[in-house]
């Protein structure tokens, strides 16, 4: 499952088991350096999580509304919070908007999922506002935080999430992805070795 995401097999196994559980944690933290595939796996998982047949294989209406490759994302139960282009951090206004959305139940799928990118870039006020959402999570919600470092996250936030660590990829995995994207053999070898296990760095 999620073969488009290279490596991170332990995290994939956790997420596969997560889907089978009745009692689930309401918040996960994907933590690791930039370019390791945290967002990619979060998006692929979101598609499966919201899928009406549990496969995430584009076979249902929910999947068709989460076409990340084409930028066609209109699923009413999917929320992505990311820094605005002109902003350095995630703002309290964004967290307040998220809190307002928490009042609404799932529309199409059984659950709702919210991915918060750059969660380690929350302002202090935004972090405290977000903490209230974690303390009283809406029914049927799953929140996934993406962060490069947990050091900048409030300890009270860390205590309310299940952490999945993303480690650097093997050189062979980085090279495989580069080749799949049309990079020449010799160049792929060099880029993979200097990438420090980060596809983002290699590209």
Predicted features along the sequence, with ranges:
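Non-catalytic interfacial helical region
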Residues: 6, 13, 83-203
């Amino acid at each position: 499952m999620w073969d488009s995401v290279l490596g991170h097999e332990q995290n994939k196994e956790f997420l596969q088991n997560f889907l089978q559980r009745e009692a689930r944690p309401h918040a996960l933290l994907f933590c690791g350096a930039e370019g390791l595939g945290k967002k990619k796996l979060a998006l692929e998982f979101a598609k499966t999580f919201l899928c009406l047949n549990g496969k995430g294989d584009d076979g249902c209406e929910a999947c068709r509304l989460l076409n990340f490759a084409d930028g066609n994302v209109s699923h009413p139960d999917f929320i992505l919070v990311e820094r605005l282009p002109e902003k350095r951090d995630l703002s309290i206004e964004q967290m307040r908007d998220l809190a307002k959305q928490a009042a609404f139940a799932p529309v199409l799928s059984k659950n709702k999922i919210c991915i918060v990118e750059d969660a380690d870039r929350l302002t202090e006020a935004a972090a405290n506002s977000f903490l209230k959402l974690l303390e009283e999570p809406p029914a049927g919600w799953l929140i996934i935080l993406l962060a490069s470092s947990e050091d900048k996250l409030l300890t009270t936030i860390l205590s309310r999430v299940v952490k999945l660590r993303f480690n650097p990829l093997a050189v062979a995995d980085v090279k495989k992805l580069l080749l799949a994207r049309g990079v020449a053999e010799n160049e792929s070898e060099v880029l993979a070795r200097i990438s420090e296990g980060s596809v983002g760095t290699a590209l």
